[in-house]
């Protein structure tokens, strides 16, 4: 009985470690039936003062179609005080950005998807990210 409990405990811990490790690779947020997965180089831990790239890895819409050509997507990067660093049309899945200081930042990705009934449905997701110091 004790051996089985130990086995189940170790198995649960291993599953938890795998889940936590893989969850740290990308951030996923959802709004209005649209899930967006974002990644920031390197490994979602950008370094302040060094140019990096924000990648939109995946856009998945429930009962709707996403296309870069028609989404009217925008990417906005801002610091914790609300000062906007980048606010531009996102016509491709990557946007270059340089986080100036080692602080907390926000990334907002917005756009629209075309529903199966032909109507457009807007979405807007926001992520938190912290830029590390360039030691």
Language-model features: where?
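Bacterial N-terminal signal peptides that target proteins for export
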Residues: 1-10
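Bacterial N-terminal signal peptides
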Residues: 9-18
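N-terminal signal peptide c-region/cleavage motif recognized by signal peptidases
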Residues: 20-22
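N-terminal soluble domains immediately following signal/targeting peptides that reside
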Residues: 24-135
């Amino acid at each position: 009985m004790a051996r089985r409990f130990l086995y189940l405990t170790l198995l649960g811990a291993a599953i938890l470690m795998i889940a936590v490790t893989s969850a740290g690779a990308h951030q996923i947020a959802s709004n209005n039936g649209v899930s967006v997965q974002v990644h920031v180089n390197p490994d979602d831990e950008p370094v302040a003062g060094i140019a990096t790239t924000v990648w939109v890895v995946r856009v998945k819409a429930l009962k709707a179609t996403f296309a870069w050509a028609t989404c009217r997507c925008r990417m906005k990067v801002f610091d914790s005080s609300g000062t906007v660093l980048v606010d531009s049309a996102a016509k491709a899945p990557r946007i270059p950005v340089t986080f100036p200081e080692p602080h907390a930042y926000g990334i907002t990705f917005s756009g629209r998807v075309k529903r199966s009934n032909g109507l457009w449905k807007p979405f807007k997701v926001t992520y938190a990210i912290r830029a590390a110091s360039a030691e």
